[in-house]
Amino acid sequence: MYYFLTQDLESAFKLTCLVKGTVDRTNFNCNCSLYKDYDFDVFLNVIKEAIKNNTEANGKFCNLKSGKVYLAVFYDDDVGQERGLLLFSIEEGSWFSNSKSKSAVEHLQVRFDSSRLSAGISRATAGLLRGLVDAGVVDRAIGGGSTSYQEEVKNAYLKLGFNMSYEFCYEKNSSSACYEKQADTDKQLEENIE
């Protein structure tokens, strides 16, 4: 299942739209649901940082605006029935795909640190995402990925035992190994890519 936090940042926290099954990019089955047991400021800070860094680092590719960024809690088909955390943009020609299609949702992986080849996330943001998992809001938080080096980064992570090109991964009821391993994998990733 997919939960989208929609509209502007303030109302985004209050309204979620539920999409059942596989994402249909044109037809959304919207059922309202509220998160009442978690601090709104944590969500807000995550979204604000994503907007700030994407806009500053990728202005010519990115159409990110506060009213057009969606936070999604989603069903991950690759790993089974887990909920994860990603950011989405609904703008035509979104930053990640640079697509000109008019799909309702364009995939935008979390990108917080443009200086890193694998589009990693900052420690501060990783801590916020980890907090969402620890609080039980989501079972799994992921971030990172790549743009021009997408396949190379994915292959590098496969060699390190990751199933996909995630720079950051933290799961409910698991050790913090994947979170703490982030800094140690940077050099290995660059070596594998080279």
Kindly label every feature range from the protein language model:
Residues V79-L85:
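Glycine-rich phosphate/pyrophosphate-binding loop shared by adenosine-nucleotide-utilizing enzymes
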Residues G144-S146, N163-S176:
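Conserved catalytic-core motifs of GNAT/GCN5-like acyltransferases
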Residues L128, A141-K154, N173:
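Conserved beta-strand-loop-alpha-helix junction that forms the acyl-donor binding cleft
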Residues V105-G120:
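A short, internal acetyl-CoA/4′-phosphopantetheine-binding micro-motif in the GNAT/acyltransferase core
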Residues M1-N54, N192:
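Short amphipathic alpha-helix that is part of the acyltransferase structural core
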Residues L117-L132:
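Conserved acetyl-CoA-binding loop-helix of GNAT-fold acetyltransferases
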Residues Y157:
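Conserved active-site tyrosine of GNAT-family acetyltransferases
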Residues N45-Y70, L86-S99:
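A conserved beta-strand-loop-helix scaffold within acyl/acetyltransferase catalytic domains
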